[in-house]
From Swiss-Prot:
Cellular-component GO terms for this entry: membrane
Pfam families for the chain: DegT_DnrJ_EryC1
Organism: Salmonella typhimurium (strain LT2 / SGSC1412 / ATCC 700720)
Stated induction or repression of this protein's expression: Induced by BasR.
Functional summary from the UniProt entry: Catalyzes the conversion of UDP-4-keto-arabinose (UDP-Ara4O) to UDP-4-amino-4-deoxy-L-arabinose (UDP-L-Ara4N). The modified arabinose is attached to lipid A and is required for resistance to polymyxin and cationic antimicrobial peptides.
Record-listed E.C. numbers: 2.6.1.87
Pathway(s) annotated for this protein in UniProt: Nucleotide-sugar biosynthesis; UDP-4-deoxy-4-formamido-beta-L-arabinose biosynthesis; UDP-4-deoxy-4-formamido-beta-L-arabinose from UDP-alpha-D-glucuronate: step 2/3; Bacterial outer membrane biogenesis; lipopolysaccharide biosynthesis
Family: Belongs to the DegT/DnrJ/EryC1 family. ArnB subfamily.
Residue positions, PTM N6-(pyridoxal phosphate)lysine: K188
InterPro entries: ArnB_NH2Trfase, DegT/StrS_aminotransferase, PyrdxlP-dep_Trfase, PyrdxlP-dep_Trfase_major, PyrdxlP-dep_Trfase_small
One example of a Gene Ontology biological process annotation: lipopolysaccharide biosynthetic process
Protein's name in the database: UDP-4-amino-4-deoxy-L-arabinose--oxoglutarate aminotransferase
Gene: arnB
UniProt subunit comment: Homodimer.
């Protein structure tokens, strides 16, 4: 009984905000008899284009899948180099490596954890075939400067927007400048358990993505049924099985309709955290100086032992004993075993400093005032205040 009560009282780092709308959306798809990729995918893609201002959107089974086929569509392969921050989820690095290319990991700004144009430019070589900036924690990277580099050197930019549904940069939603990849993973601002979407204004690129995500065929099963096309399509080039079922797409659509309200609640909680941190030794990330709207996917603090009297890992363990979950976004990719052994001499000082200290606090739309007070009380207790 005691263990069951402890689990029921546990405050997770994140929890999806699901309700009657999502249940109704799933029922509609189940009742339709078409549960795999179909009309709900088309609705989701159109709705996401309205959000970002792009001409094309391609729904996929995950943002990782989207990154894989986006790199393939650019022709990334053996001997090519792709610039990315090490402060990112390892899936980006994995996709680069699996295509035979070389990831070129660069440092980030110490206080925003954003990749900087200076670090990107210093890493450009004749072999550089793509730049992947990360919109970190819900804030945007400095796109004007990054796209200027891409244009100057003739290098495509693929925006990692997994954290950035609802994020804007200088008045435009992330993705509006070119190509961006969003995530619908369970902890993201909108979710359908697993899924993602790639936005672009390039019709040829979008066509390649659609083919690569579905076996290399020119059409999917719904296209063949609804469009009266030949029952057997031809393989244009070898592809993958990365399509998103309509069950997932319907949930994502229901979530997308709530995006403004969900993100407003996230922003309100983040503002409370910022106010509370004024009396605590833990350091939140700094906000970018350029005009933006923050989606507040994560609220991250840095736990420096010299300043706080406790290590990050000890803080996370202590919060867990108090029934409070936390996250680590991210352990720097170049410190992971495979990449540590592949790049043994790589040092990225600001990335490494943060990788040892960052901690994501609970932040989700259904978080209550009581939940918030519980986190802050625990942090005061741990800090000895």
């Amino acid at each position: 009984m005691a263990e069951g009560k402890m689990m029921s009282d546990f405050l997770p780092f994140s929890r999806p905000a699901m309700g009657a709308e999502e249940l109704a959306a799933v029922k509609t798809v189940l009742d339709s008899g078409w549960i795999t990729t179909g009309p709900k995918n088309q609705e989701l893609e159109a709705a996401f284009c309205r959000l970002t201002g792009n001409q094309y959107a391609v729904a996929v089974s995950s943002a990782t899948a989207g990154m894989h086929i986006a790199l393939m569509a650019l022709g990334i392969g053996e001997g090519d180099e792709v610039i990315t921050p090490s402060m990112t989820w390892v899936s980006t690095l994995n996709m680069i490596v699996l295509l035979g290319a070389n990831p070129v990991m660069v440092d980030v700004d110490r206080d925003t954890l954003m990749v900087t144009p200076e670090h990107i430019e210093a890493a450009i070589t004749p072999q550089t075939k793509a730049i992947i900036p990360v919109h970190y924690a819900g804030a945007p990277a400095d796109l004007d400067a990054i796209y200027a580099l891409g244009e100057r050197y003739g290098i495509p930019v693929i925006e990692d927007a997994a954290h950035a549904t609802g994020t804007s940069y200088k008045g435009r939603h992330i993705g509006a400048r070119g190509t961006a990849i969003f995530s619908f993973h369970a902890i993201k601002n909108i979710t359908c358990a697993e899924g993602g979407i790639v936005v672009t204004d390039n019709p040829q690129f979008a066509d390649k993505l659609r083919s690569l995500k579905f076996h290399g065929l020119g059409v999917d099963a719904w296209d063949r049924q609804s469009g009266g096309r030949a029952p057997q399509a031809e393989v244009l080039a070898p592809g993958y099985k990365y399509n998103l079922p309509d069950l997932n797409a319907a949930i994502a659509l229901a979530q997308l309709q709530k995006l403004d309200a969900l993100n407003a609640r996230r922003a309100a909680i983040a503002a409370q955290y910022h106010q509370a941190m004024a009396d605590l030794p833990f350091q939140p990330l700094s906000l970018p100086s350029w005009e933006h709207i923050h989606a507040w996917h994560l609220f991250i603090i840095r736990v420096d032992e010299a300043r706080c009297g406790i290590t990050r890992d000890a803080l996370m363990a202590s919060l867990k004993t108090k029934g409070i979950g936390t996250g680590l976004h991210f352990r720097a990719a170049h410190t992971q075993k495979y990449y540590r052994e592949r790049f043994p001499t790589l040092t990225l000082p600001d990335t490494e400093w943060n990788s040892e200290r960052i901690c994501s606090l609970p932040l989700f739309p259904d978080m209550t005032e009581s939940d918030f007070d519980r986190v802050i009380t625990a942090l005061h207790q741990i800090a000895g205040q």
